[in-house]
Amino acid sequence: MSATHHKTPLPQGVRLGTVMRIRGVVPDQAGRFHVNLLCGEEQEADAALHFNPRLDTSEVVFNTKQQGKWGREERGTGIPFQRGQPFEVLIITTEEGFKTVIGDDEYLHFHHRMPSSNVRSVEVGGDVQLHSVKIF
């Protein structure tokens, strides 16, 4: 299985109320995939949000990366993704953080560790068949 790598630039950044909608399918042999909200275009940009469904360990990990160092991991409850199934994830910018909604259910509200106004791109990668990334 070949890994996906897709980046959507956000030259205006994100603001309160910005919604990012990611749609795709989890392949049958999927291990992990990620959605990163990056604070730049460069390879080692800080990540205001690292959203990382890990089907191989049945968990979803949230984190940030600042100056090349990962922060403290947070985990959601259960894994709302299934191999071979389509999914829709909404990441909504709120005053407190990034609210993730998977399907119709709020999953986890990840509190800001750096200003959301620093976000300049959305990166999706790993074991995923990406259908679309839309910004509202």
From Swiss-Prot:
Disulfide bonds: none
One annotated Gene Ontology cellular component of this protein: cornified envelope
Localization annotation: Cytoplasm; Nucleus; Secreted
Domain named Galectin: residues: 6-136
Pfam families per the UniProt record, alphabetical: Gal-bind_lectin
Binding site residues for a beta-D-galactoside: 70-76
Quaternary structure (record): Monomer.
Protein name: Galectin-7
Species annotation: Rattus norvegicus (Rat)
